[in-house]
Amino acid sequence: MNQYQKKIVKGTIYSLLSGLIWGICGILGEYFFTHYQVSSGWITSMRLTLAGSLVLIWSAMQLKSQVLDIWRDKKNYLPFLAYAILGIFSVQYFFYLCVEYSNAATATILQFISPVFILFYNRLVYQKRASKSAIFYVLVAMLGVCLMATKGDLSQLSMTPLALVTGLLSAMGVMFNVILPQPFAKRYGFVPTVGWGMILAGLFSNVLSPVYQLSFTLDIWSILICLIIAFFGTAFAFFISMKAVSLVSPLVVSVISASEPLSSALLSVLFLGLVVDWSLLTAMALIILPMIFLSVEEAKESK
């Protein structure tokens, strides 16, 4: 195994780990919505503000005044703002908004259209044509996500116009979130890039849904869930997701992000009594196999 292939293996592992973390926190988020009736805007503001503050403080402790380097070049202002709003904010906010307008199954399926957007982006911007096998793996993984989210019952989908729009915006947010930050991460480092991105996204989100306007009563469990979602499911997950994109292509990362509904299903089997049937096993296979084959294909291309 050469150096490039080792990078692809590491990138695949990072991608899987970020998906697993998001799956865990997705279950916590659903519990939070159900038991505390919080809005999608509030939970987005909370997690981005807390996570961004933590990452930026950590970055300042490590880099001192260099943490401000991003802002010393005025050419960075507009592209970085685009990353914060079109990427970080959109992928969080529009997913939860889609859940509110429809349900979790519909939101999950629509968000996983992101690999298709990345294929189009690569074609339009880089004139890079995807291989037939890559397109096939993306479609198979999408089928697996659809089967897992609906359990084979398409009547569970709630495809209202608002759900379709917010779901597609969430998918575009995934695309921007894995593509736009890369120049900044390479030049200034992953930690300050993620930290500043979350702070800006959090400020924007607070304009829409101020985090200080509570619609529920804080207790020990709600505080604990907020901290886990913010620090573990947002700061840490975003960081390793960006690290993954530095090692493998954005397309591979977006396909491997299907491990999020996979991890949610596995946790539901272990802790919530979800019954394992043939539709669930088939969905798992349709999700896992494209991840493996797409990573192997990229490893072969790096030889």
Regions found by a protein language model. Name each.
Residues Q62-A105, L147, A230-V248:
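Specific transmembrane alpha-helical segments of multi-pass solute transporters/efflux pumps
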Residues M1-M46, Q156-P183, L203:
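Glycine-/small-residue-enriched transmembrane alpha-helix faces in small-molecule transporters
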Residues L54, S114-L139, L262-L281:
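C-terminal transmembrane-helix exit sites in multi-pass transporters
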Residues W22-G23, Y83-Q92, P115, A149, ...:
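Transmembrane alpha-helical core positions of polytopic small-molecule transporters
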Residues L48, A149-K151, S222, S257-K303:
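C-terminal-most transmembrane helix of multi-pass membrane proteins
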Residues I27-S39, V67-D69, L97-E100, A149-T160, ...:
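Membrane-interface helix termini and inter-helical loops of multi-pass transporters
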Residues G19, M46, Q92, T106-I113, ...:
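Helix-helix packing/entry segments at the starts of transmembrane helices
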Residues Y36-S90, F117-Y121, M172-L180, V194-Y212, ...:
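Transmembrane alpha-helices of multi-pass small-molecule transport proteins
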